[in-house]
From Swiss-Prot:
Predominant localisation class: secreted
Originating species: Vibrio anguillarum
Assembly notes: Heteromer of multiple flagellin subunits including FlaA, FlaB, FlaC, FlaD and possibly FlaE.
Protein family: Belongs to the bacterial flagellin family.
The protein, known as: Flagellin B
GO cellular component entries: bacterial-type flagellum; extracellular region
Annotated keywords: Bacterial flagellum, Coiled coil, Secreted
Pfam family, one: Flagellin_C
Job of this protein: Flagellin is the subunit protein which polymerizes to form the filaments of bacterial flagella. FlaB is not essential for flagellar synthesis and motility.
GO MF annotation list: structural molecule activity
Coiled-coil residue windows: 103-130
Example of a GO biological process term: positive regulation of interleukin-8 production
Length: 376
C-alpha cells in the first residue's frame, strides 16, 4: 500500500463509518424518546401515510363513541320524563274510574276533577321543560335529529321524539255520542245489528258487527261492542246515551256506524278530544276518560319502547366501535410505534460501532506520520 500525506483514505473510510454509526445512534435515540419508529416521511413514506389514515379513523371512532353516548343520555333523559308521564296518566285513570262510580256526589266529582286538572298541568309542564343541552325533548320541537355514530360522513342514525303534551293528537281520539238518550227501561226489539267500519292504525279496513238479542239493554250493547274489538270502546253515559271512543293510536279514520240498531240509536258526528279535554264531573265523561287515557298510555308506551330500542341499538354500536377502534390502533401501532427491544439492540450496536470507528479514525490519522520516518 502506498504511503502518502495528501490523501488519507483510511481516515476518510473510518470517518464515513463513524458518521453512519452516529446517525444510527441518533435515529435510535429519537425513536426511543418519541416512542415512534416513524417520525418523518423519510423514515417510511408509505407507512406514514397509512398510519395517518389509521389515526384519522381512530379519532373518528372515538368521537363516534362520544356521540353515541350523548344519544343514549338524551334517550335516557326523555325516557325518565316519560316514566313520570306514565305515572300521571295512571293516576288520572284511577281518578276517572273513581269518579265513574255511582256513589259519588257532584261535589265529590268536582273535587276529583280539580286533581285531574292539576295532573294535566303537571303533565304539560314535564313536556315543556324536559331538555338536554338546551334542546327541548318532549314539547314537539325536537323533531328528527341525526346522530353521527361512524368515523366517516353519512354514518348517522335518526332519532325522533313525539310531542307529549296533553293536547296533541297522539294523546287523544274521536268521541261519538248518541244524539238521543234511552229510557232506563229501553231494550233491543226488532233492530238487532250494529256495524262499525273504520281503518286501523296499520291502514287495514276493519268492520265490527254485533248482533244483539231482543230484550238486551244499552249496557249489554256496550258490552257486546267491547267484546268484539279492541280498537273502539263503548260505554253508557249520562241520560242513557251510548258513547264510543276511538283512540288515534288505534284508529286512523272516522268510524262509520251502521246497521238497524246503529240507526235506531243514532250518533252525532265524531268529535276530536284529547287528555286536555278530560271532564270527570259526569259519569259519561268519566267513562270516556278511561278509554281516552288508555289510548294516551299506548302513545307514551310506544315512544318509550322506541327510545329503549334506540338505547339498545347505540349500546351495540358502541361495542362495535370499540372493537373496530381496538383493531385500528393495533394496526397503527405495528406500523408506527417503536419496538423497544429491537431498537435498544440497534442502538447498542450503533454505539459500539461508533466507539470502534472513533478508535480506528484516531489510528488512521496517525498513518501520514509514517512518512516522516522515511525522511530521516
Amino acid at each position: 500500500m502506498a504511503i502518502n500525506v495528501s490523501t488519507n483514505v483510511s481516515a476518510m473510510t473510518a470517518q464515513r463509518y463513524l458518521n453512519n454509526a452516529a446517525d444510527g445512534t441518533q435515529k435510535s435515540m429519537e425513536r426511543l424518546s418519541s416512542g415512534y419508529k416513524i417520525n418523518s416521511a423519510r423514515d417510511d413514506a408509505a407507512g406514514l401515510q397509512i398510519s395517518n389514515r389509521l389515526t384519522s379513523q381512530s379519532r373518528g371512532l372515538d368521537m363516534a363513541v362520544r356521540n353515541a353516548n350523548d344519544g343514549i343520555s338524551i334517550a335516557q333523559t326523555a325516557e325518565g320524563a316519560m316514566n313520570e308521564t306514565t305515572n300521571i296518566l295512571q293516576r288520572m285513570r284511577d281518578l276517572s274510574l273513581q269518579s265513574a262510580n255511582g256513589s259519588n256526589s257532584s261535589s265529590e266529582r268536582q273535587a276529583i276533577q280539580e286533581e285531574v286538572s292539576a295532573l294535566n298541568d303537571e303533565l304539560n309542564r314535564i313536556a315543556e321543560t324536559t331538555s338536554f343541552g338546551g334542546n327541548k325533548l318532549l314539547n314537539g320541537s325536537f323533531g328528527n335529529k341525526s346522530f353521527q355514530i361512524g368515523a366517516d360522513s353519512g354514518e348517522a342514525v335518526m332519532l325522533s321524539m313525539s310531542d307529549m303534551r296533553s293536547d296533541t293528537k297522539a294523546m287523544g281520539g274521536k268521541s261519538y255520542v248518541a244524539t238521543n238518550g234511552k229510557a232506563p227501561d229501553w231494550s233491543v226489539t226488532n233492530a238487532t245489528d250494529l256495524t262499525l267500519s273504520y281503518t286501523d292504525k296499520q291502514g287495514e279496513a276493519r268492520e265490527v258487527t254485533i248482533n244483539a238479542k231482543a230484550g238486551d239493554d244499552l249496557e249489554e250493547v256496550a258490552t257486546y261492542i267491547n267484546g268484539q274489538n279492541g280498537d273502539i270502546k263503548a260505554s253508557v253515559g249520562d241520560e242513557g246515551k251510548l258513547q264510543l271512543f276511538a283512540a288515534n293510536q288505534k284508529v286512523s279514520s272516522d268510524v262509520t256506524i251502521g246497521g238497524g240498531l246503529g240507526t235506531e240509536i243514532g250518533f252525532a258526528a265524531g268529535k276530536d278530544v284529547t287528555v286536555k279535554d278530560i271532564n270527570v264531573t259526569t259519569v259519561g265523561g268519566s267513562q270516556e276518560a278511561v278509554a281516552l287515557i288508555d289510548g294516551a298510555l299506548k302513545a307514551v308506551d310506544s315512544q318509550r319502547a322506541s327510545l329503549g330500542a334506540f338505547q339498545n341499538r347505540f349500546g351495540h354500536a358502541i361495542s362495535n366501535l370499540d372493537n373496530i377502534n381496538e383493531n385500528v390502533n393495533a394496526s397503527r401501532s405495528r406500523i408506527k410505534d417503536t419496538d423497544y427491544a429491537r431498537e435498544t439492540t440497534q442502538m447498542t450496536k450503533s454505539q459500539i460501532l461508533q466507539q470502534a470507528s472513533t478508535s480506528v479514525l484516531a489510528q488512521a490519522k496517525q498513518s501520514p506520520s509514517a512518512a516522516l520516518s522515511l525522511l530521516g
